[in-house]
Amino acid sequence: MSAVRADVPLAHACRLLTHGPTVIVSAVHEGRRNLMTAAWSTPVEFEPPRILVVLDKSTYTRELALASGCLALNLPCSAIVDLTYTVGRVDGRELFEGLDKFERFRIASFEGPVLGLPLVEGCVAWLEGRLLREPRIEDTYDAFFVEIVSAQADPRIFAAGRWNFVQENSDLHTLHHLGAGSFALPSATIQAVRLD
């Protein structure tokens, strides 16, 4: 499923993560690339857009992100739930007949517009960012601060700075990891009004 992409203003970039979706983190360094699933990411600042993502010490994606100083967050949807689960369960250091995860699982990708990071086709949003190094926090908590430098989303589900989760686009709904290979989907978007 090839996605439609539209730029998201950086002022709205954090809105892509405020509902707590599972993300696929991708990174590249000196021609080596990898991706992994991460359940824990959140906005921490809106201007400039900064997020926090947890990357376990044992992961190859973390190693590449540290070496390059940048990473990307790809927001997968229900249409690619099996791929999302699989890339989170396979170690990127274990090559399959010399193939990296992108090649092994036939993951189509495209270059990010600012940092040239590998972004995953079939997702519904993409963010590129530079690491804001905090070694003590990284080593103690596996938490990484990232300043977002580019954001894109599929306008069929995210437009004008807002998510639009409706039954008609359920194959585009983001994934929310519940553990042990189970995921939840947002079922609808509702609008609140302020009480007087």
What does each model-found stretch correspond to?
Residues 1-196:
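Basic, polyanion-binding surface patches
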